[in-house]
Amino acid sequence: YIDDKQDVIIESQKMIYNELDNKVFSQSETFLELENKYEIKSSNILFDRNLNIISSSEITEINDKIANKFIFEKGLIFDTIREIISSKKIFIKDQNLNNYSFENSKLNLKDNEVAGKDVKVDFVDNFFGNENNDPILKGSSIVSNNKNTKIYKTVFSTCNKKNKNCRGWELQSEIFTHNKTKKLFEYEKSWFKVFEKKIFYLPYFNHPDPTVKRKSGFLTPFYKGSSNLGSSLTIPYFYSISNSKDFTFKPRFYLDNDYIFQSEYREAFKNSNLIADFSLNRKDNTSSHFFTELEGKFGDNTDYKIQIQNVTNDSYLKIHNIKEYTSLIDSESTLTSYISLEKDIDENTKLDSTIKLYEDLSKEDSDKYQYIFPDFNFSKNINLDESYNGNFQFLSTGFQKVYETNKYEALINNDFNFNSFDYITKVGIVSDYSLLLKNFNSYSENSTEYEKKNDHEIFGTFLLKSELPLKKELENSTNFLKPILQLRASPTNGKNISSSDTRIEFDNLFSPNRIGRSDMVEKGNSITLGFEFEKQNLNDSKILGLSLGNVLKDKKNDDLPTKTKLNQTRSDIVGNLYYKLNKNLELNYNFSYDKDLEYSNYDSVEATFGLNKFITSFDYITENHDFGDSEIIKNVTKYKISDEHIINFNITKDLKDDFTQFYKLSYEHETDCLLASFEYQKTFFRDGSLVPDESLVFLIKFIPFAEIRGAANSVFEN
């Protein structure tokens, strides 16, 4: 049936047209297209051409042109002129795949208005940012238009109820409003319930709807307890100044009337970004900090970065744990301010330069500052003819430094380095060689590093390295073996760096600069021998590994670092042993044994054991005999009782001094919408001016709304 006048098309197996009443009846499944705007699927439809009303008592589906779907379970009455639908029960799936249901409702398709009872909104799972959520909003009645949606007597939660008796939290409100103009969710006269128990009452609060990426408003508040500082409440407020600027105010209030006002400012420019963090604490004496970073570009090939760090009290950062509240703080004991430039002159040439100021907060005022103005790094790769079978690089580095009030150093170091390509023999031996010519220049006054006031030296090193990669395939595994030989010749003089704390291990044994110095080379002639063995299973996973190496010298050299044993004719035997016994147990052992295997100077043992939901790892590090006298043990243990219940334990202890640096025991209950934990933590400081901090903390996060953190005893008392 086609009605050109009213722009209606009806398709059905059987239809009756009553010419007297001007009505069309369908008596089977029916498809109807209205004004090229709506597609209607139903059965037994009545179309009254006089009143322009479509009605049916059967289940009916309507789809519009913007991917919204309407299902009327108990039929409908559709006024096609006003585009108003009345129905006893409506289901809607919008273009964002959210589901809505109403009873005894009226729906105005033209003005996007809804009025109904017993409303239920079943949001798509990731609507609030977590695909494990099952967000839902229910109410007794709804009135909605293009500007606002109001739902009365509502219950809202994002919690997943799968395999649970109840949702983790619910928000019961007298009135819920979605302000579509301001893009706000607003709640009036609300009770916040946790596991069906009323926790606190909120007369009013709001938060941005999920379409908002940046909007001014309060961020997650949190409450924290500390044995040193007492309890504190932080209520951060985010202010979006513009699309490129924002400001976050993070006031921290203590129960003893102390406070810290901390703020963060960010701004994005066309070719740069600025971030600044600063705070003020006024108790006895005013303490504050100011940290800022500006980084950007000049054109396509030049990067720059400016960093400024300042505090007015040396222990302020540690005492108040400022680092926890900003990403700008890397160290609580050393401040670093600098201006740096990095320029790519061409594809083979690069220049970096920096002016720096270091401030060591653990030292007296007169000796705490170190100035570097500037340091630089210039590198150039020089393309050679193919006949040279290698590449050439020129590297120039240097700095000018003043430290500890009256100590001065200026250094320029020039490296001319040739590295050959690999040579592979018919039997598979892979060899390469390198030549280094180093020109070192320094001027110093009262230096603790350089003895000579004026020093100009030339150093040279020749390295030849050969290795033979071998592979053997077995029925259940594959073995790899690689013997390594390195010849080193450095006929020029060196410097006395015997007191350096440098230590060699297998990972740097064959490195050209294994002593870790840019101002000299390793003097003398040596042969370095070693091998790497690895066993892999059929999945190409490593199950066993052993690496060993040793350095042979033609004579002693007391100027080289004692810990490296490169000052002897034979170094320590250094290596690594890795063994994965099974999927549950993994061992990793790094060692440095005396050349005669009489004793061990260094041991680092890492053991990781996991069984089902239990995993623990131990890291034991000891230095003995020639390397000193230290012994540290660390442990991290995690027991996953279930997907939502976890126990964690961390500890670090100095066994020689019987000094526990840190330990923490925590229990966590975490779901898709709720995190609750008890945490006992104690932190010790070797700095005598700081008192150990001990806290028993209860933490609860209502995701995505709020966080409460406090001393556990105060939670129980109240």
Stretches found by the model and what they are:
Residues 154, 190, 222, 240, ...:
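Structured loops at beta-to-helix junctions and adjacent beta-edge loops in soluble globular domains
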Residues 193, 220, 238, 277, ...:
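Residues in well-ordered beta-strands of folded domains
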Residues 103, 113-115, 138-139, 143, ...:
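Outer-membrane beta-barrel translocator/pore domains, especially the C-terminal barrels
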